[in-house]
């Protein structure tokens, strides 16, 4: 019985020992599975990994991993690793320009300069293909895509070889024009005004009411209305015939007559205004001489009378003259065909609208070479530097800028420049 009890006790001890060993194995195995790097020091400690922007200075072994930060614009590390050191940044060479700088956690991103694209097979920058005359742009040349062109379909044309302009719609002649040349894929249609087409007028029938001029002197209308009404009456008198003017020679001979009549009307109007002002000043001077010394000046808003029978409020006359002078100053300020004559607010608006790479396309249309365009990228505001450089040229006219904007399909900027009127006439 004692031997049987001893044997059972030994078996229990053996089972307990196996159970303990199994538990220890499971615990050690679980500890190793939680190590993300899968590497351990000689003492069994899990090796730590270096974060993004850090590289391994001393690998894990006898001691724990030693990390060091990468240097901005010199080295980078874009992986979490216990073995990878910081890698040197990529340099953009030749026809490449940097679109994203090298930082501690990301490498530099290079792209081909304006007018070039990166060939996927060779990796080199190749010149963008040019759409020839009669072909237009479908997809622009950028990054890893070359220019995609198409032959201009019917109703469109392209008369320039470049890699930025699509096929343009053909010009349609108006009813008052005749077509000299049809539109082809490589040339636009050409139109010409039809000469000798005049508006015919019929004489009024007998017995109709005819307005007779009034003997009373009417109130002087504004200058622009007086000129328009006088010219309209003159043209009606000369052209008021029931027979249309058919011969071209007669129409050409009447043009000097119209010009002479218009000049006479303008001279007469100027003389009339000068006489009225001189007469008014003369009466004011006579009134000042005959007024007593202690007489107070007329209050604001008093009516001024002249021999013409016209009653004018002095305050309204002063406000109208001030408004006229202000409008004239605005007209003089806004006049001019140079880009530098634009108001500062308009130039700043153009700079804001030229976002992205649009200013590069505009620079190419204004005649700048790719090397010169790249030099603007070193400025704080490349768009402002481009427009300032171009605006200093004698040929920097507003018409040239509008034409270049139309060629790069930026009609919104053209509309913004043309929307604001320079001045308004006083009423």
Curated annotation (Swiss-Prot):
Residues annotated as domain Death: 356-421
Signal sequence segment: 1-31
Region (Disordered): 197-223, 284-334
Major subcellular site: membrane
Transmembrane annotation, as ranges: 255-275
Region (Mediates interaction with KIDINS220): 329-344
SUBUNIT field: Homodimer; disulfide-linked. Heterodimer with SORCS2. The extracellular domains of the heterodimer bind NGF. The cytoplasmic region of the heterodimer binds TRIO. NGF binding mediates dissociation of TRIO from the receptor complex. Interacts with TRAF2, TRAF4, TRAF6, PTPN13 and RANBP9. Interacts through TRAF6 with SQSTM1 which bridges NGFR to NTRK1. Interacts with BEX1. Interacts with BEX3. Interacts with KIDINS220 and NTRK1. Can form a ternary complex with NTRK1 and KIDINS220 and this complex is affected by the expression levels of KIDINS220.
Task performed by this protein: Low affinity neurotrophin receptor which can bind to mature NGF, BDNF, NTF3, and NTF4. Forms a heterodimeric receptor with SORCS2 that binds the precursor forms of NGF (proNGF), BDNF (proBDNF) and NTF3 (proNT3) with high affinity, and has much lower affinity for mature NGF and BDNF. Plays an important role in differentiation and survival of specific neuronal populations during development. Can mediate cell survival as well as cell death of neural cells. (Microbial infection) Cell surface receptor for rabies virus glycoprotein Gs.
Comment block on domains: The death domain mediates interaction with RANBP9. It also mediates interaction with ARHGDIA and RIPK2. The extracellular domain is responsible for interaction with NTRK1.
Name of the molecule in the record: Tumor necrosis factor receptor superfamily member 16
Source organism: Mus musculus (Mouse)
């Amino acid at each position: 019985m004692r031997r049987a009890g001893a044997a059972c006790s030994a078996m229990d001890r053996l089972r307990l020992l196996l159970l303990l060993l199994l538990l220890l194995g499971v615990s050690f195995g679980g500890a190793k599975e939680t190590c993300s790097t899968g590497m351990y020091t000689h003492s069994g400690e899990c090796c730590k990994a270096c974060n993004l922007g850090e590289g391994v200075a001393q690998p894990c072994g006898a001691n724990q991993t030693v990390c060091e930060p990468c240097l901005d614009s010199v080295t980078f590390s874009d992986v979490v690793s216990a073995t990878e050191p910081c890698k040197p940044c990529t340099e953009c060479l030749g026809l490449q320009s940097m679109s994203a700088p090298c930082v501690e956690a990301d490498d530099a991103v290079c792209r081909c300069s304006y007018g070039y694209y990166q060939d996927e097979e060779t990796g080199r920058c190749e010149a963008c293909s040019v759409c020839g005359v009669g072909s237009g742009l479908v997809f622009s040349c950028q990054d890893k895509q070359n220019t995609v062109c198409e032959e201009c379909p019917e109703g469109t044309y392209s008369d320039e070889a470049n890699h930025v302009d699509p096929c343009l719609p053909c010009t349609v002649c108006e009813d008052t024009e005749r077509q000299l040349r049809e539109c082809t894929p490589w040339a636009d249609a050409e139109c010409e005004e039809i000469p000798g087409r005049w508006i015919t007028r019929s004489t009024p029938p007998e017995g109709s009411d005819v307005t007779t001029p009034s003997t009373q002197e009417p109130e002087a209308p504004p200058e622009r209305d007086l000129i328009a009404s006088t010219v309209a009456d003159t043209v009606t008198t000369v052209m008021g015939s029931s027979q249309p003017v058919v011969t071209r020679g007669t129409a050409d001979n009447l043009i000097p007559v119209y010009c002479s009549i218009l000049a006479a009307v303008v001279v007469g109007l100027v003389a009339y205004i000068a006489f009225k002002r001189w007469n008014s000043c003369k009466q004011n001077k006579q009134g000042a001489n005959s007024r007593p010394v202690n007489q107070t000046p007329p209050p604001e808003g008093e009516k001024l009378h002249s021999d013409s029978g016209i009653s004018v409020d002095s305050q309204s006359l002063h406000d109208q003259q001030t408004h006229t002078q202000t409008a004239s100053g605005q007209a003089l300020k806004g006049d001019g065909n140079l880009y530098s004559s634009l108001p500062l607010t308009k130039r700043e608006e153009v700079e804001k609208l030229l976002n992205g790479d649009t200013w590069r396309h505009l620079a190419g249309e204004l005649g700048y070479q790719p090397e010169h365009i790249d030099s603007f990228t070193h400025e704080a505001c490349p768009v402002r530097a481009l427009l300032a450089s171009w605006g200093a040229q004698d040929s920097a006219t507003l018409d040239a800028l509008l034409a270049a904007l139309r060629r790069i399909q930026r009609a919104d900027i053209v509309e913004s420049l043309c929307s604001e009127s320079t001045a308004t006439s006083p009423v």
